[in-house]
From Swiss-Prot:
Keywords: Cell cycle, Cell division, GTP-binding, Magnesium, Metal-binding, Nucleotide-binding, Septation. Necessary for normal cell division and for the maintenance of normal septation. Belongs to the TRAFAC class TrmE-Era-EngA-EngB-Septin-like GTPase superfamily. EngB GTPase family. Its cofactor is Mg(2+). Mg(2+) binds at S39, T61. GO terms for biological process: division septum assembly. It holds the Pfam family MMR_HSR1. It comes from Lactococcus lactis subsp. cremoris (strain SK11). CDD domains: YihA_EngB (cd01876). GO terms for cellular component: cytosol. GO terms for molecular function: GTP binding; metal ion binding. PANTHER family: ENGB-TYPE G DOMAIN-CONTAINING PROTEIN, MSS1/TRME-RELATED GTP-BINDING PROTEIN. This is Probable GTP-binding protein EngB. Residues 24-195 form the EngB-type G domain.
Length: 195
């Protein structure tokens, strides 16, 4: 599959199942903590500055944003989790919306789960990974913000993350930086094998 990253549109921002796109394109969901760099990851992969809206305010993505990539697939931007300044009720609502999508959507082929390479995975990161493994959803684990860690320490940080998450070696692990473009090719290779 060849992807023309110049052909991009936003299909819909969906709050529930009845709003999901009706075509049968494969979907790759992107999940991670607020401010882990999801929008930057999408923009870097697609070589666009502001396609996915980046926000200085974490917790801005409150719907499932379906991005049409070259009329061939959707990237589905899932609301960032672990954002404290959102009411418990609001978080529960997001949780139900995310769970409904991840457990019932037949078009879903894999989830890009993003973690910050600088820190041990949070409880939310661990729960998300366990959830995806429980439902047998393929995971591409992406450690973002690699430019903030000296290259010589990448292996150490990778080991810490994998150990904390009880990483399944059948999943992909990619070190990524939207600043210096590390990991773009590896990310596309991992995504395309699920399509």
């Amino acid at each position: 599959m060849t992807i023309n990253t110049n052909n991009l549109t936003i299909t819909i921002s969906a709050a529930s199942k009845k709003q999901y796109p009706e075509n049968d394109w494969p979907e790759i969901a992107l999940a991670g903590r607020s401010n882990v760099g999801k929008s930057s990851f999408i923009n870097t992969l697609l070589n666009r500055k502001n396609f996915a809206r980046t926000s200085g305010q974490p917790g801005k993505t409150q719907l499932l944003n379906f991005y049409n990539i070259d009329d061939q697939l959707h990237f589905v931007d899932v609301p960032g989790y672990g954002y404290a300044r959102v009411s418990k009720k609001e978080r529960e609502k997001w949780g139900k919306m995310i769970e409904e999508y991840l457990t019932t959507r037949e078009n879903l082929k894999a989830v890009v789960s993003l973690v910050d390479i600088r820190h041990e995975p949070s409880e939310d990161d661990l729960m998300m990974y366990e959830f995806l493994k429980y439902y047998h959803i393929p995971v591409i684990l992406v450690a973002t913000k690699a430019d903030k860690v000296p290259r010589g320490k990448w292996n150490k940080h990778e080991s810490i993350i994998k150990k904390a998450m009880k990483f399944d070696s059948t999943d992909d692990f990619i070190i990524f930086s939207s600043t210096d473009k590390t990991g773009i090719e590896e990310a596309w290779t991992a995504i395309l094998k699920y399509l």
